[in-house]
């Protein structure tokens, strides 16, 4: 009975460790690709003199500083999008929550909140507001293009 219990517990622990390993590995790969993409974006902004990144410590300090900027910004934009979707579901008859007006309001609120809540607190990242508007606008258009609003993309009726 005890051997059976320990054997069952070992399999559960092994399965949990495999799932955790896959989760950590895929997260590390994602963060690596994100880092390369952001490094390229920062080089483009520096080359065209649209941004200045003056925080330069060790690799891990830089990763933490610039990574937290991106992660906090993502959470702000994610929260705004979900809040706007919630408002649209709760007020379906309101003209502000339909069509292009809805997307313009979502984009404006997300960009403004990102700038005032996140960007102004990171003193070593100097990017003008209009450049942030263009970058977030491009990402918003990509989101609309690649993740269209629909009930079920696999519904073939």
Swiss-Prot record:
The keyword Magnesium does not apply. It is a multi-pass membrane protein. GO terms for cellular component: plasma membrane. Its main location: membrane. Keywords: Cell membrane, Membrane, Transmembrane, Transmembrane helix, Transport. The keyword Iron does not apply. The chain crosses the membrane at residues 18-38, 63-83, 100-120, 122-142. It is found in: Cell membrane. Belongs to the multidrug resistance efflux pump SepA family. Involved in multidrug efflux. This is Multidrug resistance efflux pump SepA. The lineage of its organism: Bacteria, Bacillati, Bacillota, Bacilli, Bacillales. The gene is sepA.
């Amino acid at each position: 009975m005890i051997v059976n219990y320990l054997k069952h517990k070992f399999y559960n622990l092994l399965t949990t460790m495999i799932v955790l390993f896959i989760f950590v590995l895929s997260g590390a790969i994602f963060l690596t690709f994100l880092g390369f993409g952001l490094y390229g974006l920062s080089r483009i902004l520096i080359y065209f003199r649209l941004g200045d990144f003056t925080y330069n410590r060790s690799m891990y300090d830089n990763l933490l500083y610039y990574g937290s900027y991106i992660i906090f910004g993502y959470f702000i934009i994610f929260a705004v999008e979900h809040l706007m979707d919630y408002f649209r579901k709760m007020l379906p008859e309101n003209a502000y929550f339909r069509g292009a007006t809805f997307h313009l309001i979502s984009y404006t609120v997300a960009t403004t909140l990102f700038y005032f809540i996140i960007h102004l607190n990171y003193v070593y990242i100097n990017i003008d507001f209009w450049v942030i508007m263009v970058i977030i606008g491009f990402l918003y258009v990509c989101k609309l293009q690649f993740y269209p609003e629909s009930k079920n993309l696999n519904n073939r009726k």
